[in-house]
């Protein structure tokens, strides 16, 4: 399972298609996200640390939009509550297949890991079990804005008292100066990680109709409307942030 460098947009394309999580993306995804999302490794590792505080015995821990299972692996490394199991969900068959391979490899390297179930499913239609932790790591931004509140409301209903939703998202900013500055700094981050101007421009064209970021205020108000009592931002690097939402 070699990790390939992300060169998906390195050559000029006559027409840039919308971004999809297909086999081509799966092959380069670890390199792509490390070079595109500032703070990603810190978020992933600490998601497991945070989850360990909120996880309760004999409950489900969800990784919604699991991609290759990085968050699931972090949950399994850090959570020690008896009887917990991780349910990793993604709607990309290519992602699910590779995720299962990575988790099998993790099983061979570590002992006493939480059991895990990997589902190829649409989280908008997924019936949730009682859960103490739900992680959504850069997933909500790919869901149609008009469907986000209903999903968060169902997650809130599934969360047990004392549990938590950990939500990581790219942010948009209402203040134009702030938005422009952080956007330019994010582009500088990509350049510093070896992406060319062509790659940056074509990736932007591919993803702009697929990913719709919200402001922190919108996230907070929506989470409250979904029934969460407290929203605590715990991490931000440039225009990427992670929140803890408490029931």
Swiss-Prot record:
Keywords: S-adenosyl-L-methionine, Transferase. GO terms for biological process: tRNA wobble uridine modification. Pfam families: Methyltransf_25. It catalyses: prephenate + S-adenosyl-L-methionine = carboxy-S-adenosyl-L-methionine + 3-phenylpyruvate + H2O. S-adenosyl-L-methionine binds at residues 40, 65-67, 90-91, 122-123, 137, 204. It comes from the Bacteria. InterPro entries: CmoA, Methyltransf_25, SAM-dependent_MTases_sf. Its EC number is 2.1.3.-. Catalyzes the conversion of S-adenosyl-L-methionine (SAM) to carboxy-S-adenosyl-L-methionine (Cx-SAM). This is Carboxy-S-adenosyl-L-methionine synthase. It comes from Pseudomonas putida (strain W619).
